[in-house]
Amino acid sequence: MSKNIHICNRCENNSLTFKSPHYSPEEYFEGNPKAKVWIIGLNPKLDDDKKKHTDQKKKDLREYFKNNGKTIHSYFKTFKKVSEQLFDMFEKDEAAHTDIVKCATNSFTFTSNKVRKDVIKNCQPYLIEQIKKYQPDLIICNGAAVCETIKSIVKPKKELNGLETSYVGSIDNYKVRVVLSGFIGRIDNYARRRLGKEIEQYLNK
């Protein structure tokens, strides 16, 4: 890592390199990292200008939801269909978002399952560092690959049977509630609201 540029080359064999003058991979958050509710996605997607995620200033990332207002990215607008309460928490610094994979890619999918698994494995230590440092109360997993990864990091108290939609797990001695979901951008509105009601139960405890 140079003095002025944060670089990660762990995935250069898969044509991914993290490079930013503003923040390191473990600093990558949209919103307030000290928020008690986190949404975790798989990886950021590049917008048309190819600079949306990799060149933003650290302050812009921290203030992302306050700065965007009604022009917030469509990815985040989907969460309003899940829960307006959750969506409103973004602007209040009560909810934040990060990804397992910190490098932005041209799409939300990878060229193969092997590449996806390799990239997730390489980037996973950054997420572990984030979770241990900030210790959110609630983690919402956005997508099957995210669910599987989080279950391997935040260990359930007992083996899951595959039907659970949430669990309490731990990493070291820290415990956290984890909500499991398919990719919110692809599930229907009925499933989104069912998910939202479950999330709201935990938010309102």
Q: What spans do the regions from the language model cover?
A:
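Charged, often glycine-rich, active-site loop that binds/positions anionic groups
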Residues: 96, 100-123
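C-terminal capping/extension of enzyme domains
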Residues: 2-16, 113-128, 147-205
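A short, flexible N-terminal coil/short beta segment enriched in small residues
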Residues: 62-96
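Short, solvent-exposed loop/turn segments at secondary-structure junctions
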Residues: 43-47, 101-105, 144-148, 183-187
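Active-site and ligand/interface coordination hotspots across diverse enzymes
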Residues: 1-71, 123-126, 130, 167-172, ...
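Short hydrophobic segments within beta-strands
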Residues: 40, 98, 141-142, 181
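Beta-strand-turn-beta hairpins that frame and shape the catalytic cleft
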Residues: 35-37, 87, 92-93, 169-179
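Proline-aspartate-enriched helix->loop->beta-strand connector
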Residues: 127-143
